[in-house]
Amino acid sequence: MLLGLSPVRISFAGGGTDMPEYYEKHGGIVITSTINHFTYVIVNKRKDDKFQIFSPDFETHSIAEKINNLSLKKGTELPVSIIKFLNYKKGMNLILSSDVPPRSGLGSSSSLAVNLINVISYLKGSKITKSEIADSSHHVARNILNWPLG
């Protein structure tokens, strides 16, 4: 079993000025800090190709008999997109949890994205820098899922 955790953050000032739609025209500055609340990723590798995801906090449960047959279903968009982006091909049981509710404004989606990229890269045996983790999580959220994240 592998456990990953990543902190969420709170914005003190400048929230929204980190969005390209704003800062490309006006510049931007954000004052944030992480807090002692986290997202959690728990992975159990499987000997078969089955993929199962469960998250009471992100309100999802999904099973695919083969990891190659993953499809985007409501609540699985982020983990499935990251697994496909990283080209991970082995079966797993994936449990996602968070100390804060989705859409709380504390960056739980971004925290979860960073967490998933870090854990799945580790499973693949890939060495990835913090900067690459940040860039990859931003790419998946903004360019693949078209989510408005800063």
Model-derived features: positions:
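ATP-binding N-lobe of GHMP and related small-molecule kinases
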Residues: 1-106, 118-128
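Short, conserved phosphate/pyrophosphate- and ester-handling motifs at nucleotide-, phospho-/glycolipid
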Residues: 109
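Active-site signature of alpha/beta-hydrolase-fold catalytic machinery across serine-
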Residues: 115
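Alpha/beta catalytic cores of group-transfer enzymes, especially the acyltransferase/condensing modules
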Residues: 128-150
